[in-house]
């Protein structure tokens, strides 16, 4: 695989974490699956990840986002999947509207 095909540029994950005001450190601290800072940074910057790691990042993002949402609004949360967070994932839709936009703090 060529080096240029492994770098996909800044990912939708980066914008999502910015909108939710979640830092790399908060994501690592939230992770119960031993996600590390290097993996999070690679995910945000677009370095190609394995499917397993993309799914691990997606689960951790969901956990971190749930911590940001008030308990009474948590049932309205729609979990993110890897295809929402990475533009090189199969079935990624760049026009996908975030169903959790209304849950974000002003």
Segment roles from a protein language model:
Residues 51-71:
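DNA major-groove recognition helix of helix-turn-helix/homeodomain DNA-binding modules
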């Amino acid at each position: 695989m060529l080096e240029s095909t492994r770098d996909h540029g800044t990912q939708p994950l980066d914008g999502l974490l910015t909108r939710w005001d979640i830092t790399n450190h908060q994501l690592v601290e939230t992770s119960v699956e031993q996600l590390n800072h290097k993996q999070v940074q690679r995910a945000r910057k677009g370095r190609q990840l394995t499917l397993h790691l993309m799914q691990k990042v997606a689960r951790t993002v969901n956990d971190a986002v749930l911590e940001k949402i008030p308990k009474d609004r948590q049932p309205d949360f729609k979990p993110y999947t890897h295809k929402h967070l990475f533009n090189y994932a199969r079935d990624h839709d760049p026009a996908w509207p975030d169903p959790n936009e209304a849950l974000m703090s002003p």
